[in-house]
């Protein structure tokens, strides 16, 4: 397990007045601790592992970060998992959708979860590694759990006739949600190693969905900044680049002063689901 960053002082926390916000991926875990009344992010940590789908990373994180074992006002978990399908509500049947998911992916060691997204009239069905699902259920029996795509949809996506690509970066993957007008065209997670990998996928998406590189807007969030090779590569091929703005009402404590606000967009979106 590798710690990418840990921000904030756990000694000053009163966790019973805070919300624990946690995003769990196949090779990363990040968390935020938010003061519920002031809507201020007090602490955040980001960890990675080379062993995918391994529940041990969660065990290690909880052992090494004692504050996570404290009682919280409420807990929200977002599953950042690549194996998912979005189905319009009128075509949704759980067993049929489960069969589609299992036909697309090897689901032998996975749990199938399905959740409704009423505002979009669709269901999101996805795999969660059994070891991770069991660990989280033991720790947070009364928590709120959604897929990362579901969280983004619950918060609402910007509408623009020329199209939007909302791109959120992790250390070795990025998610893309594409809208045109009020329609969702794509929600997918891609792996990457180099800036060229990111360009390849985004240019391919624009070509397949007939989106103009000149007119489409890229809204960037997560672990990316102006000086990164990824941003410089995108700047050469896309005209409209912007970093995600902070969500209304949520603030960062002084401990975060050296970090861009858009680094924590995923945590903010989890918070907005329950505030």
Language model segments and positions:
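Hydrophobic/aromatic-enriched cytosolic interaction surfaces used to assemble or bind macromolecules
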Residues: 1-275
């Amino acid at each position: 397990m590798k710690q990418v960053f840990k921000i904030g002082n756990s000694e000053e926390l009163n966790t019973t007045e805070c919300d624990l916000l946690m995003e769990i991926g196949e090779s990363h875990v990040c968390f935020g601790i938010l003061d519920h009344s002031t809507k201020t992010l007090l602490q955040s940590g980001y960890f990675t592992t080379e062993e995918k789908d391994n529940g041990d990373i969660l065990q290690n994180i909880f052992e090494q970060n004692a504050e996570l074992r404290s009682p919280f006002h409420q807990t929200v978990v977002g599953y950042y998992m690549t194996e998912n399908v979005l189905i319009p509500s009128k075509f949704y049947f759980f067993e049929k959708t489960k069969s589609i998911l299992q036909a697309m992916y090897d689901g032998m060691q996975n749990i199938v979860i399905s959740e409704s997204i009423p505002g979009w009239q669709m269901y999101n069905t996805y795999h969660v590694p059994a070891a991770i699902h069991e660990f989280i259920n033991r720790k947070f029996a009364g928590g709120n759990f959604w897929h990362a795509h579901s969280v983004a949809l619950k918060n609402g996506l910007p509408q623009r006739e020329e199209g939007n690509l909302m791109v959120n970066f992790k250390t070795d993957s990025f998610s893309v949600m594409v809208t045109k007008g009020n329609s969702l065209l794509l929600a997918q997670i891609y792996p990457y190693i180099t800036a060229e990998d990111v360009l390849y996928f985004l240019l391919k998406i624009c070509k397949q969905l007939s989106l103009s590189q000149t007119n489409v807007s890229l809204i960037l969030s997560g672990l990316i900044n102006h000086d990164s090779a990824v941003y410089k590569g995108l700047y050469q091929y896309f005209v409209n680049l912007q970093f995600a703005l902070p969500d209304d009402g949520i603030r960062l404590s002084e401990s975060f002063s050296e970090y861009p606000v858009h680094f924590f967009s995923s945590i903010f979106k989890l918070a907005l689901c329950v505030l």
